[in-house]
Amino acid sequence: MSNISTPRISGLTEYTSQPDKSHYDSIESHFLLPDGTPDYLKLILTSKVYDVCNETPVTPAVNLSSKLGANIFLKREDLQPVFSFKLRGAYNMMAHLPQETRWKGVIACSAGNHAQGVAYSAKHLNIPATIVMPVVTPAIKYKNVDRLGAKVVLHGNDFDAAKAECNRLSEKHGLTNIPLFDNPYVIAGQGTIGVELLRQIDVESLKAIFVCIGGGGLIAGVGAYIKRIAPQVKIIGVETYDANAMRQSLQKGERITLSEVGLFADGAAVKILGEETFRLCQQVVDEIVLVSTDEICAAIKDVFTETRSIVEPAGALSVAGLVKYVESHPEIDHSASGYTAILSGANMDFDRLRFVSERAKLGEGSEVFIVATIPEKPGSFGKLIDLVHPRAVTEFSYRYSNGELEKSDGKAHVYISFSVDNAKAEVPRILDDFKGAGFDAIDISHNEFPKSHPRYLVGANQPVTNERVFRFEFPERPGALVKFLHGVKSKWNITLFHYRNQGSDIAKVLAGISVPSHESDQFQQFLDNLEYPYAEETDNVVYKLFSQGD
């Protein structure tokens, strides 16, 4: 019988909207340091995680090691029973609950790996568990939790609403709230990964451990142990450019709250860090590396090449950061260095693989996108292809621009992508070759607009009066698209529209809207009230070329 109940919920950004302010009341005095803070060395070494968790192996990354000229290892947390490290922290906290509170049950707010970790732990410990998720949570996620025996409550339109309901149910029924990351026992559970690493890898050669950062529980736990036992080993965190709460917080010396977070690496999409995790990270984190979506996709491919396993975007963050770190520091002799990346999880949505495959080549620098303007006359296409040859062309799109066909002054805009061995080294030479042939060319490999909506632009009509173009990100839930269209249709004409689902909780929409200049303020108010992330692309060079014929 199903344990799913469904009142109502929105976006799937998992974060602590109201940081847990509980301190160390549940920690026994002999596990506290003289200053009253937890002794994480003791907490980690006495952790109870191995009742349910595996000591995961370390896999040598042979191909990456050869490519980067270093000794690379992958810590395989994707091989845990719930395919994520989250089981360690959830189980350790729940295993330390006193018997008099266990019978009441536990509760958590999560639609991701933490939910499965709590549900799995509760089943093993015979503790009733309730998991609160947003109403728009994909069925595959809540059904997995339901299958593990937890009661699933779907509530609210976003994680703020779901968390508020979680807190309400916790207080009403006396349920123990199992936080995502901000609890000493959760942190200590994650820290057992550090214990294993120092047993599995030669400490003398281990130079750095790369760890993905969401709320900070994993890096805080691993760092707390490593810095006590092998302080010379660097702890390097990895975040995305659009979800970098730790980087900004460490720079400012206090926790900051992000107004928006990127959702591709949704397992690490956190707006505000935990209080305790941030306190620890200030002490143990040596450096933060920021990576892009394309670099994460390339890292997923790298992991697949090494292991034939597919990790989720957040699970590949550490590898993306490791690769970027090594490539960004040519002054370091990496040949004698051992670097380890923790693969944090493998709960990948299958539908995302198409997107990952498309972007991986860009991320690893083996494919480039170029827009070229060539004369509209016989022989131009052939000349263009000769410049690219012998590289393999992966996509070729064309749009006639200005001038009349029977005249010789017409121009064609060409969108072309092709394979390269090393984008950084080859692209400048390629652009010089194009220029020498009399072709204007622009590298758009790092321009998000054409990467998300390129095919739609080719063949567009002439410029539209007062047209403004925007990229929107919509939560994949009933009513999101309707809300947008209803808000626009009564006021302004939609001149262009392209929707694309990436196989995740978020869909990308490209929209052109005719907005007279005297209505700009009213339109801005509409955008603000919409409450969806957006970026204006009206001045984007690719839009101008393909849609306006400039």
UniProtKB/Swiss-Prot annotation:
GO CC, alphabetical: mitochondrion
Pfam families, A to Z: PALP, Thr_dehydrat_C
Domain ACT-like: 368-446, 468-539
Major place of residence: mitochondrion
Domain of life: Eukaryota
GO biological process, one term: L-serine catabolic process
Required cofactor names: pyridoxal 5'-phosphate
UniProt modified residues of type N6-(pyridoxal phosphate)lysine: 86
Catalytic reaction(s) noted: L-threonine = 2-oxobutanoate + NH4(+)
Chain intervals with Polar residues compositional bias: 1-19
Pathway(s) it belongs to: Amino-acid biosynthesis; L-isoleucine biosynthesis; 2-oxobutanoate from L-threonine: step 1/1
Subcellular location(s) of the protein: Mitochondrion
GO molecular function: L-serine ammonia-lyase activity; pyridoxal phosphate binding; threonine deaminase activity
Similarity comment: Belongs to the serine/threonine dehydratase family.
Listed name of the protein: Threonine dehydratase, mitochondrial
Source organism per UniProt: Blastobotrys adeninivorans (Yeast)
Organism phylogeny: Eukaryota, Fungi, Dikarya, Ascomycota, Saccharomycotina
Gene name for this UniProt entry: ILV1
